[in-house]
């Protein structure tokens, strides 16, 4: 002790890098305890995780103000940061920004649609694009208008916060929720509640990777919930039953009624649809279950490899049982295990139920599904559609995951008027129109990953097929520009993945047949490889005519292709 006192210091106690206590100053010190991101050493995480650790994703507003004031385009780090606010610098495809909104359940008012048209006209390229998450995007926004766009959007009662990078994306619900005669449950309140929960919890803006959630209420139009990380699927129990508590296997009484099944880990770019998790959830508990599952992913997802950071990889590593057990620890009520077979599932969705005129649950009212070719709307069309909704409906609009929109609440007396007006502005409403089944990602015109110009080629392809044949069974054709599958090509009747082909690197597609969602869920199988786009319209014309000639009575295209092997299809369609 004399030696310590003579040196003029206090007796030392510190912590080593491994968390142990030490009396040796050389081994300890606050700066030696390694920083971590949810348990992963900071030295092991990706650069994106380091950026988020240095500054919270929602603390970048001043950066955007600075860039907007200077009219400056962002570097790599700020490109990443600005996406947290819904502004995407899409270089090199376009040296400008794309706005991606958040429109929970795809619900818009006529006034909001007009306001979005104003934003597209004043700051963008005069167009908007309906996305596969029932959302809207506006492109070709200059850097000087970064903040102008977002403040105008907020003035409309909308936001873009968290619509990109490592966040929970736009929350989808059944497109016909609230007016569908077949639905088991109106899912809009769940989508809106989760939307606001996300907006008010900062920790949810620091996920390991993007996250998709959908609520399927059992209506006529498929929500494509099985392509989401979490899909809540409405089911019905016809009579009193008993489930088992996940906590202790104790029996739990279940009164008859509507519940949610929870499906997990849909990620179509990896050829995986969401699978039933074996549990039954009361609607009143759905939001808590969703929040708990997201928190488990937040705390345990991989932050060292962005290619393996989605929920699928955590569940692959742990197994479903452990994932549910970890989620259970965060809940004040027990998970209920219940066999899927004892639930009454919804009937199959109406193929192309998002296109055409359909009766609503409300007497004398109809919804009109509008064909929006590859999701592109001009500002004139946006305003006219808003006018139609306001003048002949209730002023409400719905966007769907099929890249189109619905005008609900149209009285019987005005249906023909609305149909005529749609044709006058270059839009359609016929369920037999092949353009109604086209889905296309942004493509090389606005995305650096895309190998092909998907949207323009989709329109060319649709026009050719419309001219050459008449469909009597609706068919979906999905075009995606790269393996990320933003257009979900593996679940289309016909799926097309863009590739470069030949020595000249011309644009072409791998061709997939037999995909589906919902009650008809399946991952399609690749039949043709690297078909130049110049040959594709003729090939698909031959494919569809062969199907029509050789199918069984009432057989869908998906069923026809599924009952044949790849080699058989290649031979049949090459004749």
Residue spans of the language-model regions?
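Peripheral terminal and linker regions in Fe-S/redox and tRNA-modifying enzymes
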Residues: 2-575
């Amino acid at each position: 002790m004399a030696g310590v006192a003579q040196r003029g210091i206090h007796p030392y106690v510190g912590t080593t890098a491994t968390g142990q206590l030490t009396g040796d100053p050389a081994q300890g010190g606050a700066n030696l305890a390694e920083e971590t991101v949810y348990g992963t050493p900071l030295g092991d995480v990706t650069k994106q995780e380091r950026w988020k650790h240095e500054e919270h994703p929602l603390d970048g507003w001043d950066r955007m103000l600075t860039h907007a004031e200077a009219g400056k385009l962002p570097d790599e780090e700020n490109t990443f940061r600005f996406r947290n606010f819904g502004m995407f610098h899409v270089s090199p495809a376009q040296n400008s920004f794309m706005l991606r909104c958040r429109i929970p359940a795809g619900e818009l008012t006529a006034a909001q649609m007009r306001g979005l048209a104003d934003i597209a006209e004043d700051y963008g390229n005069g167009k908007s694009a309906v996305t596969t998450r029932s959302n809207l995007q506006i492109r070709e926004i200059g850097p000087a208008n970064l903040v102008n766009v977002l403040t105008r959007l907020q003035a409309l009662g909308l936001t873009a916060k968290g619509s990109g990078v490592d966040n929970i994306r736009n929350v989808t619900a059944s497109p016909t929720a609230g007016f569908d005669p077949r639905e088991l449950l109106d899912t809009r309140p769940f989508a809106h509640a989760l939307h606001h929960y996300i907006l008010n919890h900062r920790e949810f803006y620091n996920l390991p990777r993007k996250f998709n959630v959908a609520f399927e209420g059992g209506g006529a139009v498929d929500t494509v919930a099985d392509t989401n990380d979490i899909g809540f699927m409405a089911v019905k129990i016809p009579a009193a039953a008993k489930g088992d508590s996940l906590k202790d296997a104790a029996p739990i009484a279940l009164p008859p009624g509507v519940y949610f099944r929870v499906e997990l880990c849909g990620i179509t770019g990896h050829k995986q649809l969401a699978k039933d998790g074996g549990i039954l959830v009361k609607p009143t508990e759905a939001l808590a279950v969703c929040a708990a599952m997201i928190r488990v992913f937040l705390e345990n997802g991989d932050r060292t490899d962005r290619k393996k950071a989605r929920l699928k990889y955590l569940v692959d590593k742990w197994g479903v049982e452990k994932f549910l057990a970890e989620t259970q620890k965060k809940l004040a009520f027990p998970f209920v295990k219940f066999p899927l077979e004892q639930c009454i599932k919804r009937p199959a969705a109406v193929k192309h139920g998002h296109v055409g005129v359909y009766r609503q649950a409300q007497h004398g009212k109809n919804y009109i599904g509008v064909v929006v070719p590859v999701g592109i709307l001009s500002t004139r069309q946006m305003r006219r559609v808003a006018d139609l909704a306001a003048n002949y409906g209730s002023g409400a609009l719905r966007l769907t995951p099929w890249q189109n929109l619905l005008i609900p609440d149209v009285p019987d007396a005005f249906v023909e008027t609305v149909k005529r007006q749609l044709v006058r502005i270059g839009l359609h409403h016929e369920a037999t129109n092949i353009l109604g089944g086209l889905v296309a990602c942004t493509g090389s015109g606005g995305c650096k990953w895309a190998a092909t110009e998907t949207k323009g080629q989709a329109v060319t392809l649709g026009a050719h097929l419309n001219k050459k044949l008449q469909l009597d069974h609706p068919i979906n054709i999905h075009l995606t520009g790269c393996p990320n599958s933003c257009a979900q090509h593996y679940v289309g009747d016909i799926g097309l993945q863009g590739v470069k082909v030949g020595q000249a690197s011309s644009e072409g597609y791998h061709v997939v047949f037999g995909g589906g969602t919902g009650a008809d869920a399946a991952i399609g199988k690749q039949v043709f490889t690297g078909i130049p786009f110049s040959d594709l319209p003729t090939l698909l014309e031959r494919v569809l005519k062969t199907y029509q000639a050789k199918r069984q009575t009432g057989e869908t295209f998906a069923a026809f292709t599924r009952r044949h092997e790849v080699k058989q299809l290649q031979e049949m369609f090459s004749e």
